[in-house]
Design a protein with these regions (language model features):
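Single conserved hydrophobic/aromatic residue that forms the stacking wall/gate
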Residues: 1-8, 12-13
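Alpha-helix boundary recognition
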Residues: 7, 36-40, 158
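N-terminal small/polar loop signature for handling phosphorylated ligands or for N-terminal nucleophile
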Residues: 14-18, 22-43
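Hydrophobic alpha-helical scaffolding
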Residues: 21, 25, 44-45, 95-96, ...
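Glycine-rich phosphate/nucleotide-binding loop
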Residues: 33-121, 125-134
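Glycine-rich phosphate/pyrophosphate-binding loop and the adjoining helix
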Residues: 116, 125-162
């Protein structure tokens, strides 16, 4: 049984199709507060695109920002994966974009494809490099470039023993 949180009218339709899934219906403002005060109570949130975009940006803020947030839209038959952040035209060509969101999105996609070993390795490598704090882009408080952070993560994937 997977706890499921829904925002909006989708819950009534879902309840008929999946009676074994525990769910709750919250207004979006309450959901935003609960994501801050009780994030452990959420496994899945189903909502409209507008509210989902707002809540996912809030969730990204809890883990360090959009540069660290992967994203997956998973349907019955297919999954679509993309980093949460946008194209960031204000930093285009400057070599300072944080690659972690894209790399973590790749790991999420690999997990969806049941490639668990490499997915876990990528996730652990990103965690280790970011936690070490030696090679960080400006959004994470460092002064490294996109290429330098990417290289550190790739090196950690290749050299890591996990």
């Amino acid at each position: 049984e997977i706890p499921l949180r829904l925002v909006g009218s989708e819950m009534c339709i879902r309840d008929r199709n999946y009676p074994n899934i525990e769910s709750n219906d919250f207004y979006v403002d309450a959901t935003a507060m609960y994501l801050i005060t009780q994030p452990q109570n959420f496994d899945v949130i189903v909502t409209s695109n507008l509210f989902g975009d707002i809540l996912s940006d809030e969730g990204a803020g809890l883990v360090g920002g959009l540069g660290l947030a992967p994203s997956g839209n998973i349907g019955d038959d297919h999954g679509l994966f993309e980093p949460v952040h946008g194209s960031a035209p204000d930093i285009a060509g400057k070599g300072i974009a944080n690659p972690c969101s894209m790399i973590l999105t790749i790991a999420m996609m690999l997990d969806y494809l049941k490639e668990y070993e490499i997915s876990n390795k990528i996730n652990k490598a990103v965690e280790n490099v970011v936690s070490a704090g030696k090679t960080l882009t400006p959004d994470l408080g460092g002064n490294s470039t996109t290429s330098e952070l990417t290289k550190s993560i790739v090196d950690e994937i290749l050299e890591g023993d996990y």
